[in-house]
C-alpha cells in the first residue's frame, strides 16, 4: 500500500475538510481530526497538521494538494547505511510517562520492516501498534527507557535539575549511549527533532555519559528513517502499556493527550484522592493541573 505523508498548514487543512466532506469516514484514532476515503485512497488529517494519503491512488490524490513525487527519492537513499534512530512518546500527554527509544536498523532489516507496515506511530492505530511492537522488539536491537510520571515530577520543575526539554535530551542521549555500549556501529545517528541542535548540545554538556559520534536532529525524521519509525512504534507501545497500568492503579480510565477530557478526569482524581493521585499518574507542570483544580471550585 502506498503511503504519502506531508505537512498541511491551516489553509490546506480547511481545503481538505471542504473538498472531501462528502467522502468523510469515521476513525477511532484520537490523533485523527478528519478522515475520508476517495478514489482508491484514504486521507487522514492529524492534530499535528500531518496529512497522510494511503492506498493505490495515494500519490495521485496527494499531488492535487501540493505533493511533489520527487521528494520521496532522497529518503530511501539516506537509509542505505546502518542507522540509530530515536523518538519519544508521551511528552504531549498529561497522563502517563515519557517513553524514549533508540533503535539500530541496517539495510538488511528494511524488507522485513516494510512488510510489517512500519511507519510513524501517529499514523498507526493503537491496535496495530500493539500487534507489531513486540515483533520489532524481538527483531531490532534497541534500548527503551520509561520515565514514570512520579519520577518525571521529581526531576522536572523550576526547583529541580531538568525542564521539559532537558529531560528529553538526557533520555535520548542515554538510550543512544546504551546501544553504542553494546557494540553497535551506526554510520548515522538521527533524533526526531524536539528542539534546535544548538539547544540540544547545550543541554548535552550536563550529561555524564558522552560519546564521540555526531548526532543529527531532523524534523519529521520518523517519515524519513525506518530506525526512527521503529523507535516511534516501540515507544508508543511502551507509553500505552504504562498508561493502562496507571489507569488500573487509580481506578480511572486515563486519556492520552492534554485536552479537556484530561482536565475532567484529573478533577475527579483530585476530588477522590487529592493531589497525590496526580503526582502518581500525571505530569504536574502541565496546565491541566490548574484547569482541573478550577473545575472543583
UniProtKB/Swiss-Prot annotation:
Q: Which GO terms describe its biological process?
A: DNA replication, removal of RNA primer; mismatch repair
Q: What is this protein called?
A: Ribonuclease HIII
HAMAP family for this protein: RNase_HIII
Query: Signal peptide: which range, if any?
Result: none
Q: Which GO terms describe its cellular component?
A: cytoplasm; ribonuclease H2 complex
Where it sits in the cell: the answer is: Cytoplasm
Q: Enumerate the PANTHER family for this protein.
A: RIBONUCLEASE, RIBONUCLEASE H2 SUBUNIT A
Can the keyword Chloroplast be found in this entry's annotation?
no
As its record notes, the protein acts as a catalyst of: Endonucleolytic cleavage to 5'-phosphomonoester
Q: Which residues form the RNase H type-2 domain?
A: 81-297
What is the purpose of this protein? Answer: Endonuclease that specifically degrades the RNA of RNA-DNA hybrids.
Alphabetically, the GO molecular function entries are: magnesium ion binding; RNA binding; RNA-DNA hybrid ribonuclease activity
Query: Which Enzyme Commission number(s) are on file for it?
Result: 3.1.26.4
Q: Which cofactor does it need?
A: Mn(2+); Mg(2+)
State how the cofactor is bound.
Manganese or magnesium. Binds 1 divalent metal ion per monomer in the absence of substrate. May bind a second metal ion after substrate binding.
* Residues involved in a divalent metal cation binding: 87-88, 192
Amino acid at each position: 500500500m502506498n503511503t504519502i505523508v506531508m505537512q498541511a498548514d491551516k489553509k490546506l487543512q480547511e481545503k481538505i475538510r471542504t473538498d472531501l466532506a462528502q467522502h468523510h469516514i469515521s476513525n477511532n484514532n484520537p490523533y485523527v481530526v478528519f478522515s475520508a476515503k476517495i478514489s482508491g485512497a484514504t486521507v487522514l488529517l492529524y492534530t499535528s497538521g500531518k496529512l497522510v494519503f494511503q492506498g493505490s491512488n495515494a500519490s495521485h490524490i496527494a499531488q492535487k494538494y501540493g505533493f511533489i513525487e520527487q521528494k520521496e527519492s532522497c529518503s530511501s537513499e539516506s537509509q542505505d547505511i546502518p542507522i540509530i534512530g530515536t523518538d519519544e512518546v508521551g511528552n504531549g500527554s498529561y497522563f502517563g510517562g515519557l517513553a524514549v527509544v533508540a533503535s539500530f536498523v541496517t539495510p538488511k532489516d528494511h524488507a522485513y520492516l516494510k512488510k510489517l507496515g512500519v511507519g510513524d506511530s501517529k499514523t498507526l492505530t493503537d491496535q496495530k501498534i500493539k500487534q507489531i511492537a513486540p515483533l520489532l522488539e524481538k527483531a531490532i536491537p534497541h534500548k527503551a527507557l520509561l520515565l514514570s510520571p512520579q519520577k518525571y515530577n521529581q526531576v522536572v520543575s523550576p526547583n529541580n535539575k531538568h525542564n521539559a526539554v532537558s529531560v528529553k535530551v538526557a533520555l535520548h542521549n542515554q538510550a543512544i549511549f546504551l546501544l553504542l555500549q553494546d557494540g553497535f556501529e551506526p554510520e548515522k545517528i538521527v533524533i526526531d527533532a524536539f528542539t534546535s541542535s544548538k539547544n540540544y548540545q547545550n543541554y548535552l554538556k550536563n550529561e555524564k555519559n558522552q560519546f564521540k559520534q555526531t548526532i543529527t536532529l531532523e524534523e519529521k525524521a520518523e517519515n524519513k528513517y525506518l530506525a526512527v519509525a521503529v523507535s516511534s512504534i516501540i515507544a508508543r507501545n511502551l507509553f500505552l502499556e504504562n498508561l493502562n497500568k496507571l489507569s488500573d492503579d487509580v481506578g480511572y480510565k486515563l486519556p492520552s493527550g492534554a485536552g479537556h477530557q484530561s482536565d475532567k478526569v484529573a478533577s475527579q482524581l483530585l476530588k477522590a484522592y487529592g493531589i497525590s493521585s496526580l503526582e502518581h499518574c500525571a505530569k504536574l507542570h502541565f496546565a491541566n493541573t490548574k484547569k482541573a483544580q478550577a473545575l472543583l471550585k
